[in-house]
Design a protein with these regions (language model features):
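Bacterial N-terminal signal peptides
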Residues: 13-26
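Positively charged, low-complexity intrinsically disordered regions
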Residues: 9, 13-14, 291
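Initiator methionine at the very start of the polypeptide chain
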Residues: 1, 29-30
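Disordered, low-complexity tails and leader-like regions
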Residues: 3-4, 19, 299
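Outer-membrane beta-barrel pore domains
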Residues: 47-50, 93-95, 106, 115-117, ...
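Interfacial loop-to-helix transition and helix-capping segments at the boundaries
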Residues: 169-175, 205, 238
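Outer membrane beta-barrel
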Residues: 31-165, 174-178, 182-190, 244-248, ...
Length: 339
């Protein structure tokens, strides 16, 4: 009887193991993968000297997917960023349940709002000073996020990263970069705040971000501010802000289905990237202001989007400053294809 009981118990356990294996295979069989990308081709001409160029601003490709309901991945690269190849993102994400998620790999540090817009979702042909110069940071590290489940629909994200650039992953260091980001939607508004501390060289740089976004009907508006403080260095604090509005109307009986108009004012005081030269920080970007106006004609049928965009940018510098090509008054015409 004992032998028969043992046999039955063994058979029961084997059946349970086989069933769980079949279920696991079923979960794997339900994997989902998708390939996407965006191409941005442009022509721009400087209005002061008539110099112009054609360029492929981005030719970005990505693949994303999941191997089971709570495990996903994302990889992206830019095959032509103004002629240069860039490997951008590679990470895995684990949904632990109850609003908790973990992400590890190479990705954008969780800080700021405008920097998180991809080239297929830019509001303007050129990124804001905040998105391009002040906080354009990808790094290798890990982050954890928590989304409140009940009364407060907020998400809080905390990340820890290597201080070196993504092209120098063999560098060992005694310091780390840290970032904290909180997002709270309130009706048509979304309030975002964050703190970040990085050390790209021997000087630590502390940053604080605040942003309010609004979206209702065809109107979208946003105002973002970043304070950047250089610890134990005489370089003055950098103040950056970005304010913009977009208004779109639907179109019927045409190839395109949306027409929108945009306006933006962004600025920053003198800025350093945090790299020390001759014992102290140097200025990488001068104090500047910019006014941008534009219009976009778009066909949107997710996940496909095609846009024709025209922008005029007016720059303001201190008297006597000779702005480099691309950072002067100009008109930009761009074709964007997202798939």
């Amino acid at each position: 009887m004992d032998l028969l009981f043992s046999f039955r118990e063994c058979a029961r356990r084997c059946a349970a193991l086989l069933f769980s294996g079949v279920m696991a295979l079923g979960a794997v069989a339900q994997t989902a993968h998708a390939i996407g990308g965006v191409v941005r081709a442009r022509y721009e001409i400087q209005t002061l000297d008539g110099r112009s160029r054609f360029a492929i601003r981005n030719s970005r490709v990505w693949i994303r997917g999941s191997f089971m309901p709570r495990l996903s991945y994302y990889v992206s690269t830019d095959l032509c960023d103004q002629g240069a190849f860039q490997f951008l993102d590679a990470y895995g994400k684990l949904d632990l349940g109850r609003g908790v998620a973990m992400q590890a790999g190479q990705f954008r540090i969780p800080f700021g709002v405008d920097p998180f817009r991809g080239p297929g979702n830019y509001i303007f042909a050129d990124r804001s000073f905040i998105g391009r110069d002040i906080d354009n940071i990808r790094a290798d590290g890990v982050q954890a996020s928590y989304t409140f489940q009940k009364d407060i629909p907020a998400t809080v994200t905390l990340g820890v990263f290597s201080p070196n650039t993504i092209t120098d992953q063999n560098h060992w260091s005694k310091t780390l970069n840290y970032a904290l980001k909180a997002e709270l939607p309130v009706g048509p508004f979304k309030v975002t705040g964050g703190l970040q501390t990085i050390q790209p060289d021997s000087v630590r740089v502390n940053m604080a971000d605040a942003c309010v976004s609004f979206s209702k009907g065809g109107l979208t508006a946003e105002a973002e501010y970043i304070l950047e403080h250089y610890v134990a260095d005489p370089f003055p604090d950098c103040h950056s802000y970005n304010v913009w509005v977009d208004y779109g109307i639907p179109l019927e009986h045409t190839l395109f289905n949306r027409l929108s108009f945009q306006a933006r004012f962004d600025a920053s005081t003198s800025h350093s990237s945090g790299v020390v030269t001759n014992g102290r920080l140097s200025e990488d970007h001068p104090a500047r202001k910019r006014l941008t106006i534009g219009s976009t004609l778009g066909y949107v049928n997710k996940p496909v989007k095609c846009e024709l965009q025209v922008n005029y940018q007016k720059y303001f510098y201190k008297e006597g400053y000779a702005a480099p090509d691309g950072r002067q008054d100009k008109v930009v015409a761009e074709l964007i294809v997202l798939f």
